[in-house]
Amino acid sequence: MKTIYQNITLLASFLLLFTSCGCEDEKIEKQPVNYTVLLDLSDRILVPQQLDKDFALIETTFKSFEKQARQNLVISSKDRFSIKIIPQKNSPLNVNHYEDLLQLYLDETEVAIKNKSLVSLSKTLPKILENLKKEALYGSTSNTYFGVDIWAYLHDNGMGLSKSGYENKIIILTDGYFDFESQAHVIQDKNQYTSTRFLNDLTTSNWKLISESQQYGLLPIQLDKNTKWIVAGISGKKSTDILQTEKITYFWEKWLKQSGVKRIGIILNSSKTDMSSKLSEQL
């Protein structure tokens, strides 16, 4: 009888331990998500419908953020959403104004107004983007727009875009070029540069073999290894080079990997619907 009692006690202990472990697993909280969209407003936006595509991707990202925030109670959400406009020389655009309007950090928002703030940005987002489009299109020719320094921006701010304790997702809306008006602005270390001008030297079908043997590429920087980076809108500028999109994709992936990134997504420039669908799958 004593043995039976001991066996029952032992079995009950195992069941209690198993149940406790299950409860602990359920208590493990999923990390909040930090969504950041980087916007390149260089002369690429003169391409018809380009900003419409960019803004569709921004709205897709916001919907993912909103869904994430509402998975549990909004009042307990710590998720973050923001748009960062890459600085551009001589641009009359009030960057700080739009960045303030296009961000919502629920971890820094008072509990009482979290839901109101989320609903408000959801309603006003299309209008804000419409106004941004009007002000961003301040010129009609490429000469009016200076190139944006993506390399310098990410060199200075890349690590700061990722927040500790979060699942970080950074989306860069760009054609993929690191172009400037003057080569004097470019830093070079052997065959690694801070611009993509070296693409002009890789014009043959064996460009990849040449780039690997001579170590062509972009100068690596330091980026958070756990952050997911998505580059959306990559597009070739030269109709005479049918391999240009492939080259840009190759060097972006190479650069991000050399900079420490493990998770990379690439979305080529296509229709608004197609790009939005692909982004939604990767978020």
Question: PLM ranges: what are they?
Answer:
Residues G22-E26:
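Bacterial signal peptide processing site
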Residues I85, K114-S122, F180, I187-Q188, ...:
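Scaffold/interface architecture of coatomer-like assemblies
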Residues F146-T227:
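Flexible, glycine-rich surface segments
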Residues M1-C21:
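Sec-dependent bacterial lipoprotein signal peptides
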Residues I45-Q49, S91-N94, D179-Q183, K238-L243, ...:
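Extracytoplasmic/secreted cell-surface and envelope-processing proteins
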